[in-house]
């Protein structure tokens, strides 16, 4: 079973749109929750979870930051080498937990970061997202795509060794937009960062790449 927890992401409902655009054979394996942390907090989902997908930034969208029940379940999942797909800014899903801040590979840094790291930024511009020359297995499957003007999440903190799978250029500088890393317990983390507005998360190639990442991680 895939568990997919999302917020409304400032009323864009990006996570919900991504879920709805999954191929039917994947969608039927997903339990999706938007703006509802009850199951995440209750914790029993962890025993059934084959893949954890997040489109969530803790403490935003009028939701509380997930608490101790969620923390225990997420850590148990990670400790049994669970894989994760972190969409958009979800490296900050649980940014108040110190151990979480250290395991996501790259990290969207919130204002007033507990570690004192300078906040990440999101300039708005059209962008071309390009697959890297990398021997990671996913790079042989991913495809390039172009997005209209949208927030581009950049200036992330690197918290562990990563393979960069996709990048985009902003003002002459190249930034990661998809990365692979591993938790201390051996689970793989794919950060897939592009996509905010509805017209961007409805992009066919973006959705195809997300579906490829899901299949790879299962």
Region locations from a protein language model:
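Aromatic-Pro/Gly-enriched surface loop or interdomain linker
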Residues: 1-51
């Amino acid at each position: 079973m895939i568990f997919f927890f999302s917020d409304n992401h400032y009323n864009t409902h990006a996570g919900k749109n991504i879920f709805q655009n999954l191929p039917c054979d994947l969608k039927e394996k997903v339990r999706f929750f938007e703006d509802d942390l009850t199951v995440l907090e209750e914790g029993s989902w962890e025993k059934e979870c084959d893949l954890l997908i997040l489109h969530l930034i803790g403490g935003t969208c009028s939701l509380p930051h997930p608490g101790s029940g969620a923390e225990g379940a997420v850590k148990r999942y990670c400790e049994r080498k669970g894989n994760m797909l972190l969409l958009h800014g979800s490296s900050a899903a649980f940014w108040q937990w110190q151990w979480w801040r250290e395991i996501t590979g790259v990290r969207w840094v919130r204002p007033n970061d507990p570690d004192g790291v300078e906040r990440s930024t999101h300039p708005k511009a059209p962008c071309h997202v390009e697959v890297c020359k990398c021997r990671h297995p996913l790079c042989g499957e991913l495809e390039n795509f172009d997005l209209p003007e949208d927030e581009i999440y950049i200036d992330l903190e690197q918290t562990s060794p990563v393979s960069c799978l996709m990048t985009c250029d902003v003002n002459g500088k190249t930034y990661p937009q998809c990365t692979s890393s591993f938790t201390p317990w051996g689970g793989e983390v794919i950060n897939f960062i592009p996509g905010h507005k509805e017209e961007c998360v409805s992009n066919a190639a973006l959705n195809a790449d997300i579906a490829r990442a899901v299949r790879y991680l299962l």
